[in-house]
Amino acid sequence: MENAGGAEGTESGAAACAATDGPTRRAGADSGYAGFWRPWVDAGGKKEEETPNHAAEAMPDGPGMTAASGKLYQFRHPVRLFWPKSKCYDYLYQEAEALLKNFPIQATISFYEDSDSEDEIEDLTCEN
């Protein structure tokens, strides 16, 4: 019986050690990725407070603008860039490269239906 109690004590000791070891490992693993950019963490290492996006922040005189350059210095993530479907293949590589040079953030490009799509114009001319 002492062996069973001793083994049980050893198992609970191992479980306590594993429970203590889990968070320590996780903290150590996170510190290894300190060089990666994370949009939700500012340069000082603090997490951004989650606040809802407001239309005023997107306006040129909103609080997210700098007075000197007029460029945004802080973005609310996830950022979506809207791109017309008519240009999704023709000019995507050249224009997207120029766009990313001027807008160097992590973003998702979302395509939208535009009214002056070349496909629609071709369909209209073929029907006549």
UniProtKB/Swiss-Prot annotation:
Q: What does this protein do?
A: Plays a role in somitogenesis. Required for somite segregation and establishment of rostrocaudal polarity in somites.
| Region Disordered: start-end pairs | 1-63
Does the record's keyword annotation contain Amino-acid biosynthesis? no
Record note on domains = The ripply homology domain is required for transcriptional repression.
Q: By its UniProt entry, which InterPro entries does this protein fall under?
A: Ripply_fam
Where, by residue number, is the motif WRPW motif?
Answer: 37-40
Please verify whether the record's keywords include DNA repair.
Answer: no
Sorted alphabetically, the Gene Ontology BP terms of this entry are: bone morphogenesis; determination of left/right symmetry; embryonic pattern specification; negative regulation of transcription by RNA polymerase II; Notch signaling pathway; ossification; post-anal tail morphogenesis; somite rostral/caudal axis specification
Q: What is this protein called?
A: Protein ripply2
Q: Where is the composition biased (Low complexity)?
A: 9-22
Could you tell me which species this protein originates from?
A: Homo sapiens
Keyword annotations of the record = Developmental protein, Dwarfism, Nucleus
Q: Which disease is it linked to?
A: Spondylocostal dysostosis 6, autosomal recessive: A form of spondylocostal dysostosis, a condition of variable severity associated with vertebral and rib segmentation defects. The main skeletal malformations include fusion of vertebrae, hemivertebrae, fusion of certain ribs, and other rib malformations. Deformity of the chest and spine (severe scoliosis, kyphoscoliosis and lordosis) is a natural consequence of the malformation and leads to a dwarf-like appearance.
Region of interest (Ripply homology domain), residue spans: 77-112
- Protein's cellular compartments: Nucleus
Regarding protein family, the annotation reads: Belongs to the ripply family.
Q: Which is a Gene Ontology cellular component entry for this protein? A: nucleus
What is the protein's major site of localization? nucleus
